[in-house]
Amino acid sequence: MILELDCGNSFIKWRVIHVADAVIEGGGIVDSDQALVAEVAALASVRLTGCRIVSVRSEEETDALCALIAQAFAVQARVAHPVREMAGVRNGYDDYQRLGMDRWLAALGAFHLAKGACLVIDLGTAAKADFVSADGEHLGGYICPGMPLMRSQLRTHTRRIRYDDASAERALNSLSPGRSTVEAVERGCVLMLQGFAYTQLEQARVLWGEEFTVFLTGGDAPLVREALPQARVVPDLVFVGLAMACPLD
């Protein structure tokens, strides 16, 4: 079995899959390396034969995680690294090594699934969008604060905005104008996300008309799902690209 890891800015998304058919044995989201090891170790009858990682962490943090995995499960982790071109997709950055690996792998996965022009909208800690043309040219993209960052900034820099996570969840039952601070903040942030997504969709239409596929991924993708009914929701899109970048037998 293979352990796949997507190490983001705030959390680690993980899953264990069977080598032969990629059937998922288990998975989850954790907030620390130690929690990751504990959750994977708790899976019954799992014997890992490999591990592959995509990380936007520092090199030192990623190396430390690889060492921990080697110690806990006796496997050497393969870490995805930036390249100028792979699987028919050409990196669109002037300095290709500066493109975040999560964005690069999501673009690879999307192009592989779409077999043509595609727009990737990834809504996590940051909201990201990337455009890939029908001939595999990565045309660049956009990054702005995602829901967690918008919420955090308002809570941190506005003294009278204070509420708990349960209140935030209840506030999202509707997007009508808020009648409390928590409703106003949470719904306003969702509308910001939806506006970001709409703008990317219009950009794609200018480029390609209607001849493209939209992919939604990331933990907050459900918040814009109704606004983009034509989009394909692929929660593990980065893992699709990771398997292409780091094949394991």
Curated annotation (Swiss-Prot):
K(+) binds at D122. GO terms for molecular function: ATP binding; metal ion binding; pantothenate kinase activity. ATP binds at D6, C7, G8, N9, S10, F11, I12, K13, T125. Its cofactor is NH4(+); K(+). InterPro entries: ATPase_NBD, Type_III_PanK. Gene3D superfamilies: 3.30.420.40. GO terms for cellular component: cytoplasm. GO terms for biological process: coenzyme A biosynthetic process. It is found in: Cytoplasm. It catalyses: (R)-pantothenate + ATP = (R)-4'-phosphopantothenate + ADP + H(+). Pfam families: Pan_kinase. Its EC number is 2.7.1.33. Pathway: Cofactor biosynthesis; coenzyme A biosynthesis; CoA from (R)-pantothenate: step 1/5. Substrate binds at Y93, G100, M101, D102, R103, T181. SUPFAM superfamilies: Actin-like ATPase domain. A monovalent cation. Ammonium or potassium. Keywords: ATP-binding, Coenzyme A biosynthesis, Cytoplasm, Kinase, Metal-binding, Nucleotide-binding, Potassium, Transferase. Catalyzes the phosphorylation of pantothenate (Pan), the first step in CoA biosynthesis. PANTHER family: TYPE III PANTOTHENATE KINASE. Belongs to the type III pantothenate kinase family. Homodimer. This is Type III pantothenate kinase. It comes from Pseudomonas putida (strain ATCC 700007 / DSM 6899 / JCM 31910 / BCRC 17059 / LMG 24140 / F1). The lineage of its organism: Bacteria, Pseudomonadati, Pseudomonadota, Gammaproteobacteria, Pseudomonadales. The gene is coaX.
